[in-house]
Amino acid sequence: ITLNSDTNRGVADDVVVEFLGVPVFYTPHHEWVLEGRGSGFLAPTFGRYSESDPSDINDSRLGDYKVRIPYYFNIAPDRDFLLTLNQLSSRGSVVEGKYRQLIANNKYLDKGRFEVEGHYLNEDDITNNKRWLLNSSIDLSINDKTELSLVTNRVSDKDYFKEIAHSDTSATALHSHIDLTYADEAQDLNMAVFAETEQLINSGSASYLRAPEVSISKVFEGMNDRKMDLSLVSTKFTHKEGNTTTKKTGLRTHLQANFTRPITTNAYSLTPKLNLSSTDYALDNTTNESRSIYSFGLDSKLFLEREASLFGTDLIQTLTPRLAYNY
C-alpha cells in the first residue's frame, strides 16, 4: 500500500480481503482518494431484464442483461460530471451523462443550482431508431426577492422508460415547467408567472396544462388595523386527450378579496369581515361561465376580569365569552 499526500491518492496492489481467514475478494490494483472526493471509476452494476415485459424484474424468462460502468469526474468543488456506459444486450450501448453545478453569489445572481442529464442510444438494435433522454433543472435566486425555477423532462418516445431505462413504467407523463416568483415581505406583495408542458409516456392519455398562469397578491393596511387582502390568479388552461383537444379549454380568472376592520377596547372586540370570491371562465367554442360568492362575518368578544383569591394567593379571574356570526 502506497499513500501519497502530494497527489492525494492511495494505491494498493495485489489486494486480498479475508473473512475469518478465508479470502473472499481479490483485485490486482486499487486506487482511492485520501481526502475529499476525486475522479475515478465507481462500482459497476449488473442486471437482467426481459423484452417480453421489461417492467417485470421477476419474469422467469429474463434472457437479456445490462451492465452499467460509471466514471466520476471531480471537475471543481462546485461542479462534477458522471459519465456512464449502459450496455443493453438486446438494444445496444447507451451513453449517459449527468452534470451538476452550484452557482455562487456574483454581480448577476444571488445563488443557484444547475443540473442536466442526457442519455443517448445512436441506433436501437431492435427498432433501428435513435433513442434519447434529456432532463435539466435550474434554480436561481436572482436577488433577495426574485427566484426562477426551470425544469425540463423529455424522451425520444413514449416507450423509452419501458424499453431502455427499465424504470418509471407506471408514470403517464413527463412534466416541464418554468416558475418565476417575486416576494416583497416589506410591501406584502407576491407575484408569480408559471407555465408548464408535458409529454405523454407509457400509453398515458389524459393531460391538464397551465400555460401560462399569472398570479398576484397584495395586502393593504390602513389606520386602526384596517386590512384588505387582494388575490388575482389568471390561468390559460387546456385539457387534452392524446394530441387532440377534447375537453374544455380557455382562460380562468379568479379574484379573492378580504376586508377586515377590528375594533378593540379594554372591554370588548368586534371584527367584521367581508369576503368576495369571483371566478370567470372564458371558454373556447362554448358558453362562458362565471360565479360569485359573497360572505360576511362578525366575530365578537367580551373581556371580563375580576380579582380573586385562592389559598391566600391573589389572582385575576378572566372570562372571555365569544359570539361569531357568518353569512
Question: What feature does the model see in each segment?
Answer:
Residues T2-Y327:
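Outer-membrane beta-barrel proteins and related beta-barrel translocases across Gram-negative bacteria
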